[in-house]
Amino acid sequence: MSKERFEWLDRWITHEEDVIRTTGSESNVKEIYDACAELEKDETNFILNQFSEFANHVGHHEVTGRALENIFLSYKEKNSNLRLAGFVAASGSAGTLGAGERLKENHGAKIVAVEALECPTMLYNGFGEHNIQGIGDKHIPLIHNVTNTDVIVAISDKATDSLNLVFTSEEGKSFLVEELGASPEIVDQLRHFGFSSTCNLLAAIKTAKTLDLGPDDMIVTVATDGSELYESEKTHLLENEFPKGFSSEAASLIVNEHLRGADTSNVELLDDVGRNRIFNLGYYTWVEQQGIEFSDFEIRRDQQFWKHIQKLAPVWDDLINEFNSQTGLIKTK
């Protein structure tokens, strides 16, 4: 994890020991589970697990999904032929993928799950270490509705690392505008993209090429982190790969390889066999390691389970309003 991510955490805590620094890389989630298991032995601790907390899925289905749907509908008012072809999101906890459930149900969008090529758990039943921070934890989250996922895409951290230099340097931005003719306004926004944001962008491009989409097809994705979290990573890459400085020529090579060169490799259009293959991988984490009942694991294969939990948001809202009313802190209508 980058230096800036730890510094961000430090600003929000009172005691340094409140942050437990586990060993390993971005894909070493098992070590986090082990640390949480130790904490849970103290009955005063309560573990909130974003990988298995279904409210994470439901929240994105209700909030993120509605927000993205409104964006699509606003564009559709300008182009009645516009079709929502896909929703693209990298899988960390898999919570954000819940937004795709609403977009698929209401508009037929394909749900595209993304991971790091260096740790291709879904794509190739693979493993490894990578630097796309915030995603790709070498397991299948319990809250990932795998059997409703349509496409898997893997993106290399070499692409996200190097494009970070292009998007945040004057040399890179000048190349995009002057040599490629990109809009200065759009290029200026790219400086905000962190590693997983760029990962989603590249996966959207690969999806569009794989599905042979046209001008009336829309793909939506999310920029899930900012480049300010990776200044130290940028410095490290410059020192190791570009010791004489980053140039327009270097930017050209990176863009041609990783942005313009984004192709249909490392993409799988899922059928039922592929979906069940990925779903079954979760057994080892959740049943064997984490002690989830087999029946509770298996019921997630049925889409009726997901439709049921997606209807819980209004119930939770009522409970929140009731609680607020009883405390007197917030007056409810």
Listing of model-derived features with the role each one plays in the protein:
Residues 1-38:
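Gly/Ser-rich phosphate-binding catalytic loop and adjacent alpha/beta segment
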